[in-house]
UniProtKB/Swiss-Prot annotation:
Activity modulation: Inhibited by plumbagin. Activated by phorbol 12-myristate 13-acetate (PMA). Activated by insulin. Inhibited by diphenylene iodonium.
UniProt cofactor(s): heme
GO biological process: bone resorption; cardiac muscle cell differentiation; cell morphogenesis; cellular response to glucose stimulus; defense response; gene expression; heart process; homocysteine metabolic process
Topology with respect to the bilayer: Multi-pass membrane protein
Phenotype for H222Q: Loss of H2O2 generation with predominant generation of superoxide
Record's protein name: NADPH oxidase 4
Induction of the gene: By 7-ketocholesterol (at protein level).
Extracellular side: 38-62, 125-154, 210-424
EC number: 1.6.3.1
Topological domains annotated Cytoplasmic: 1-16, 84-103, 176-188, 446-578
Source lineage: Eukaryota, Metazoa, Chordata, Craniata, Vertebrata
Major place of residence: cytoplasm
Catalyses which reaction(s): NADPH + 2 O2 = 2 superoxide + NADP(+) + H(+); NADPH + O2 + H(+) = H2O2 + NADP(+)
Length: 578
């Protein structure tokens, strides 16, 4: 089916507009800097010595400055959560743009990697040219101490060279540890290496303080390429033949021939030798604002998370899932948000994000998370909270909470699922443990659904193991019964899909009788499901929310952009596992 431009603009329009603006800024900055160092009269002599390497190194540096400043803004998660929840961002389309903060962070990171490669390659050429093209006439312009000096000395004995090598090493560690395989299998490595960005920014501020590249300051008394007759003062000579015979070098573009020569057959002689000065470091102007903002937020988050929570209970669920319920004074959160957990007994520095499956309300202060036991951190954390003999049992006695290790939380932080209650119709699709963001929304509806705009919720949950449905089977049954008792049976449409049939009889029973008729074997037929939703919600805007594997996300994303004959628009929102 053809793409609906109305749906495409709703889902992709603002994102692509922002991408175009960001890309234009990079291209404009690169090209403007390239022309400055290629044609600017103040860099005439430096360009003669270094050539194209000078232009590429400085142009790539300007792009690096821009992206090294922008990459920090998406990481100000407390600020983003505040903007999302405040009335200062009333537009839902603008709030949805905040969901792309992680994608923008990755885009800036990839750009930094690419242009760092260009920058390094250009400076390797510059180091060679500094050595080979050593200038006897303009000694202060040289970075090398003598002609044919080993270029490696410039790399390892100068401040820009040494800090540049260190930054390349740090960046390489951050890149390799950011791959999907390492993030999933060993999150510790990703966490520790990513915090090296503090070292990277310290090296960056030192990197620009070397002063190796210099520009000419006295253009008025020494135009680039002017004739010097070794006299103490300037004079005009009526010998145009002298100019054509002794001065073969053309004037650089952007700097015209002296009017005395072009109009009166006279040429201006140099009044003095050129003077050079190191470029003023500009990197700190780019990064100081975002870096200070980020550091201020980290300080605020440290103060906010400095008090440990009180663990109320710990439960072990099937398929290696653990639930923790806790309380903390003055803690508030909205459905769909997430927090980070920090347990010093497991790791002194690591913080791991988990979606809230239960939010505090006005009547109860308890909140909770569900953890899938994947990786060494969650395994060690489970072993601390649940003794081996109790890992397969139900809720632990409250009296044991005094033996729990100290646990600190940071947050809450915003996520796309906060918008699910702001649509009149929402479609929530979960794959496996991806159900956790929707659990807090279902709990909120169970508590009180009337204050929210939502009037119809389609909840689709796909699992391989039927035991996984037991994580929230009680919640789904209570929600179903609540709306039946309130004569609103069409408020929540629950569909559970099981991709494997082994042990299906284990969930069939009186306790979960309400779910039996909503349990299907196989995978959803997504196209038919979207057509059905569009048919029963003609002309409305349906919010589509997905948390699951990439294959599932791509399918729903594609269907959300397709046209339908009912005038229904699907707005796609996604959360990722990693």
């Amino acid at each position: 089916m053809a793409v609906s431009w109305r749906s495409w603009l709703a889902n992709e329009g603002v994102k692509h507009l922002c991408l175009f603006i960001w890309l234009s800024m990079n291209v404009l900055l690169f090209w403007k800097t390239f022309l400055l160092y290629n044609q600017g009269p103040e860099y005439h002599y430096l360009h003669q010595m270094l050539g194209l390497g000078l232009c590429l190194s400085r142009a790539s540096a300007s792009v690096l400055n821009l992206n090294c400043s922008l990459i920090l803004l998406p990481m100000c998660r407390t600020l983003l959560a505040y903007l999302r929840g405040s009335q200062k961002v009333p537009s839902r389309r603008t709030r949805r743009l905040l969901d792309k903060s992680r994608t923008f962070h990755i885009t800036c990171g990839v750009t930094i990697c690419i242009f760092s490669g260009v920058h390094v390659a250009a400076h390797l050429v510059n180091a060679l040219n500094f050595s080979v093209n050593y200038s006897e006439d303009f000694v202060e312009l040289n970075a090398a101490r003598y002609r044919d000096e080993d270029p490696r000395k410039l790399l390892f004995t100068t401040v820009p060279g040494l800090t540049g090598v260190c930054m390349v090493v740090v960046l390489f560690l951050m890149i390799t540890a950011s791959t999907y395989a390492i993030r999933v299998s060993n999150y510790d490595i990703f966490w520790y290496t990513h915090n090296l960005f503090f070292v990277f920014y310290m090296l960056l501020t030192l990197h620009v303080s070397g002063g190796l590249l210099k520009y000419q300051t006295n253009l008025d008394t020494h135009p680039p390429g002017c004739i010097s007759l070794n006299r103490t003062s300037s004079q005009n000579i009526s010998l145009p033949e002298y100019f054509s015979e002794h001065f073969h070098e053309p004037f650089p573009e952007g700097f015209s021939k002296p009017a005395e020569f072009t109009q009166h057959k006279f040429v201006k002689i140099c009044m003095e030798e050129p003077r050079f000065q190191a470029n003023f470091p500009q990197t700190w102007l780019w990064i100081s604002g975002p870096l200070c903002l980020y550091c201020a937020e980290r300080l605020y988050r440290y103060i906010r998370s400095n008090k440990p929570v009180t663990i109320i209970s710990v439960m072990s669920h099937p398929s290696d899932v653990m639930e923790i319920r806790m309380v903390k004074e003055n803690f508030k959160a909205r459905p769909g948000q997430y927090i980070t957990l920090h347990c010093p007994s497991v790791s002194a520095l690591e913080n791991h994000p988990f979606t809230l499956t239960m939010c505090p309300t006005e009547t109860k202060a308890t909140f909770g998370v569900h953890l899938k036991i994947v990786g060494d951190w969650t395994e060690r954390f489970r072993d601390l909270l649940l003794p081996p003999s109790s890992q397969d049992s139900e809720i632990l006695p409250f009296i044991q909470s005094r033996n729990y290790p100290k646990l600190y939380i940071d947050g809450p932080f915003g996520s796309p699922f906060e918008e699910s209650l702001n649509y009149e119709v929402s479609l929530c699709v979960a794959g496996g443990i991806g159900v956790t963001p929707f659990a807090s929304i279902l709990n909120t509806l169970l508590d009180d659904w009337k204050p929210y705009k939502l009037r119809r919720l389609y909840f689709i949950w796909v699992c391989r193991d039927i035991q996984s449905f037991r994580w929230f089977a009680d919640l789904l049954c209570m929600l179903h019964n609540k709306f039946w008792q309130e004569n609103r049976p069409d408020y929540v449409n629950i569909q559970l899909y099981l991709s494997q049939t082994d042990g299906i009889q284990k969930i069939i029973g009186e306790k979960y009788h309400a779910l039996n008729s909503r349990l299907f074997i196989g995978r959803p037929r997504w196209k038919l499901l979207f057509d059905e939703i569009a048919k029963y919600n003609r002309g409305k805007t349906v919010g589509v929310f997905c948390c699951g594997p990439n294959s599932l996300s791509k399918t729903l994303h594609k269907l959300s952009n397709q046209n339908n004959s009912y005038g229904t628009r699907f707005e796609y929102n996604k959360e990722s596992f990693s």
